[in-house]
Regions:
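A short beta-strand motif characteristic of beta-propeller blades
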Residues: 62-69, 104-110, 145-150, 185-190, ...
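C-terminal motif of bacterial Sec signal peptides marking the signal peptidase cleavage site
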Residues: 23-26
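Short loop/turn segments that connect beta-strands within beta-propeller blades
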Residues: 99-102, 140-144, 180-184, 221-225, ...
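Repeat-blade elements of multi-bladed beta-propeller folds
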Residues: 30-44, 70-93, 113-137, 150-177, ...
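A short helix->beta-strand "capping" segment at the edge of beta-propeller domains
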Residues: 48-74
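Bacterial N-terminal signal peptides that target proteins for export
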Residues: 2-15
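Beta-propeller domains
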Residues: 90-102
């Protein structure tokens, strides 16, 4: 059901590594003969089933399986996990909210025509901000009622960054703009040198940061878009930007990992790779976990760029740090528990034939598995 969805394609793109022999790497946004064969293989793949023993070795146990409502023939485009809820957006413009404790549907509604495209929604307090190409919905998370609906007059391409009463979007035309939600107008606009495909992030009380796919990096004053620091690299990114309030951390398609000073743009460090870095990196308590083809999974001192350890035999997305001693890592075809201090494999279990993985917290987080059949399964710490 999900093999054609944005959720699956994003998962495939961000977890494709030459060192990881995963079938996810065959998925792309352009349909070819080989893609059609891969789609046929995916369609005939056996349904995913829960390996309770394997999850137990990772220190997790199954808690529930839920089913976000979708329109007939629709697929899940976006999924986000929070402490208390999960949000889903289907290709039929259906937004659904499930209770994190039980998996029950809190509410579900179709916002627009089934052909309308939505970016990933974001939450602030009890409001969900869901944006289509040109409109922004503010929805009550309690019952799904519409609080406000605004036309933005611009084709957006990223999730919104919500700061006070501003919703900040990026576009394929390279425009980063702030929409003033209370009075329904575009407050400011800033032109980058190429398409913006990742959402802006807040780096301080006064500034946000964004990157174009041509490698232009800038911080802008949130209230007026006055330029702060700027930097330039040779490519954009397939992953979200990260910050600790000191550095801006980028996994770049120009085959490098970077850290830049958010104040003046000084490059703290750079780690090169022989391939574009496409796996989402993770920042936790002064350590950056990232994967490249050359070094596999790495633990990097975020301040200095020193590689504290690396394991060239594995690579993937670090979902959560558990018990302050282990990393839970999804490689694209298996889930692993990794020793946080040395990078050694503690436990592993196969995890194939799924559409995506989400967690609700970088520290001791729950793990949610989204299946091709349209279900979501929650696994909590034992």
């Amino acid at each position: 059901m999900f093999e054609k969805s944005a959720l699956y394609k994003h998962t495939a793109r961000t977890l494709t590594l030459a060192l990881a022999l995963s079938t996810l790497s065959a998925c792309s946004s352009t349909q070819t003969a080989s893609d059609a064969e891969n789609d046929a293989q995916l369609a005939s793949t056996p349904a995913w089933s829960i390996d309770h023993e394997g999850w137990g070795e990772l220190g997790y146990q199954w808690e529930w399986t839920g089913y976000p409502p979708m329109q007939p023939g629709a697929v899940i485009e976006h999924a986000t996990a929070y402490d208390d809820i999960l949000t889903f957006v289907g290709s039929g413009s259906t937004v659904s909210v499930l209770e994190a404790n039980t998996g029950k549907v809190r509410w579900s509604r179709q916002l627009d025509r089934s052909t309308t495209r939505f970016v990933e929604p974001v939450r602030r307090d009890d409001t969900l901000y869901a944006a289509s190409d040109t409109e922004l919905w503010e929805l009550s998370l309690r019952n799904g009622n519409t609080i406000d609906r605004d036309s933005m007059g611009t084709l957006v391409n990223t999730s919104p960054l919500i700061v006070d009463n501003l919703a900040i979007f990026g576009t394929l035309a390279g425009e980063l703009f702030a929409f003033q939600m209370e009075n329904d107008f575009k407050l400011w606009s800033y032109k980058f040198d190429g398409p913006i495909e990742q959402p802006a992030i807040q780096v301080s009380d006064e500034y946000i940061a964004a990157i174009s796919q041509k490698g232009e990096i800038r911080t802008l004053e949130t209230i007026n878009a006055h330029s702060g620091m700027s930097a330039k690299i040779a490519g954009g990114t397939d992953t979200k930007l990260l910050t600790d309030g000191i550095g801006l951390y980028i996994a770049s398609l120009d085959q490098s990992l970077y850290a830049f000073d958010i104040v003046d743009g000084f490059r703290f460090w750079r780690i090169r790779s022989s391939d574009p870095v496409t796996v989402q990196h993770t920042l936790h308590e002064g350590l950056l976990y990232a994967s490249t083809r050359d070094k596999g999974l790495m633990c990097i001192d975020s301040a200095t760029g020193d590689v504290l350890w690396n394991n060239p035999e594995i690579g993937g997305w670090v979902l959560s740090v558990v018990d302050d001693s282990e990393l839970i890592v999804w490689s694209g075809f298996e889930m692993l528990a990794i020793d946080k201090d040395r990078g050694d494999i503690i436990a592993r279990t196969p995890l194939k034939n799924i559409a995506g993985v989400r967690t609700d917290n970088i520290t001791d987080g729950n793990i949610y598995i989204i299946t091709f059949e349209g279900s979501v399964a929650k696994f909590g710490r034992r």
